[in-house]
């Protein structure tokens, strides 16, 4: 037997399963499983990516100054307190790598994003799951779960896969209730879908224990390029830059992301279209007897009567070329997460769910 063994915790990591993209036997599908922007990226981002092709022989920027400057301008932030990564996943990994080790604990909520647990285990730490209250983050449960070994607390707000969120006062109470030496990480992957929401800016700028993360994979439609960023206290960003590789983002990704964030009109179009069809989708599902919590993201968590009904509906949809997401791995076996698609995709989804309910009656 081999004596080559991984570090403790590594083999406790379940392989991440992304949303399916294909259905065997079908050439065309409607993919509503990965919370992607159905409108795609800004035309300006596509043009910038193409233009970057002439520089493929050059190493990319090491400090991401152009992208950090654009983010700072659009969001009203200090560019020196921004760090960029290959998706917000990498920022999450940096945080665990830098602040978590054997014996340390990291808190995440019951239905929180899977990468919190994965990155914690990869760093040798212990993930601690705390309950939610009816699929909503419970600040009191988090504070009750904190020990002298807690180093990070991850909150997705809005949360994936539930779509629920808590307000600024609750977040401030959480930040103030954490002990010294513990960072609160606000994952704002879906924050751009919430009007007039800073996703943590005020908390970051008024406290030394709060970091916020964002992604270009959702409203900006750049999931294939893997770009994310974080904003935090100077001392935290300095630490994260010490573990960040010097060329972690490609020239094309940097160019496309900068163009995307500057195209505010296109972003607003995407936000408005999502709000319109998200409301329509939730209403139509409710009329079919399928409830969902109020979503602040670009998906709806459809709740069925049982895991069996959810599974049967998933199979029914797949047979018709519509792919949604089972979320049993998030301890929601009786639910399906349905990305808000374009008009055609949403109508096709509702028609198929209606047909499923009719044949099951």
Swiss-Prot record:
Biological processes annotated in GO: L-histidine biosynthetic process
Enzyme category, top tier: transferase
Q: Which organism is it from?
A: Dinoroseobacter shibae (strain DSM 16493 / NCIMB 14021 / DFL 12)
Q: Which HAMAP family match?
A: HisC_aminotrans_2
In the Enzyme Commission scheme, what number(s) does this protein have?
2.6.1.9
This chain's protein is named Histidinol-phosphate aminotransferase
**Where does the record locate the signal sequence feature?**
none
Recite the UniProt keywords alphabetically: Amino-acid biosynthesis, Aminotransferase, Histidine biosynthesis, Pyridoxal phosphate, Transferase
Q: Which family does it belong to?
A: Belongs to the class-II pyridoxal-phosphate-dependent aminotransferase family. Histidinol-phosphate aminotransferase subfamily.
NCBIfam families assigned: hisC (TIGR01141)
Report the catalytic activity.
L-histidinol phosphate + 2-oxoglutarate = 3-(imidazol-4-yl)-2-oxopropyl phosphate + L-glutamate
Residues that the record marks as modified (N6-(pyridoxal phosphate)lysine) are: 218
The UniProt entry, under InterPro entries, shows:
Aminotransferase_I/II_large (IPR004839), HisP_aminotrans (IPR005861), HistidinolP_aminotransfase (IPR050106), PyrdxlP-dep_Trfase (IPR015424), PyrdxlP-dep_Trfase_major (IPR015421), PyrdxlP-dep_Trfase_small (IPR015422)
């Amino acid at each position: 037997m081999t004596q080559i063994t991984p570090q403790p915790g590594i083999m406790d990591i379940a392989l991440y399963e992304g949303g399916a993209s294909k259905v065997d036997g079908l050439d065309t599908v409607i993919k509503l499983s990965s919370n992607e922007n159905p409108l795609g990226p800004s035309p300006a981002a596509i043009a910038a990516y193409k233009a970057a092709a002439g520089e493929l022989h050059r190493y990319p920027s090491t400090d991401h100054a152009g992208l950090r400057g654009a983010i700072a301008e659009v969001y009203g932030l200090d560019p020196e307190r921004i760090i960029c990564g290959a998706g917000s996943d990498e920022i999450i990994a940096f945080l665990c790598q830098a602040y978590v080790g054997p014996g340390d604990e990291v808190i995440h909520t019951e239905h929180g994003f899977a990468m919190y647990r994965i990155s914690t285990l990869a760093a040798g730490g212990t993930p601690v799951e705390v309950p939610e209250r009816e699929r909503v983050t419970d600040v009191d449960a988090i504070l009750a779960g904190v020990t002298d070994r807690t180093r990070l607390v991850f909150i997705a707000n809005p949360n994936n896969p539930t779509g629920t969120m808590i307000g600024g006062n609750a977040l401030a109470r959480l930040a103030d209730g954490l002990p010294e030496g513990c960072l609160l990480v606000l994952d704002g992957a879906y924050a751009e879908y919430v009007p007039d929401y800073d996703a943590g800016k005020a908390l970051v700028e008024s406290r030394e224990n709060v970091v916020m993360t964002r992604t270009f994979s959702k409203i900006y439609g750049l999931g294939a390029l893997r770009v994310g960023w974080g904003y935090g206290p100077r001392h935290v960003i300095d630490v994260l830059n010490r573990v960040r590789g010097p060329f972690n983002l490609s020239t094309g990704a940097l160019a496309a992301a900068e163009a995307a964030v500057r195209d505010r009109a296109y972003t607003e179009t995407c936000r408005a279209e999502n709000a319109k069809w998200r409301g329509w989708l939730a209403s139509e599902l409710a009329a079919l007897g399928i409830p969902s919590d109020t979503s602040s993201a670009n998906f709806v968590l459809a709740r069925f009567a049982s895991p069996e009904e959810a599974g049967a509906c998933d199979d029914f949809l797949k047979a018709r070329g519509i792919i949604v997401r089972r979320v049993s791995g998030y301890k929601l076996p009786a639910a399906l997460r349905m990305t808000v698609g374009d008009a055609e995709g949403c109508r096709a989804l509702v028609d198929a769910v209606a047909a499923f309910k009719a044949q099951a009656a």
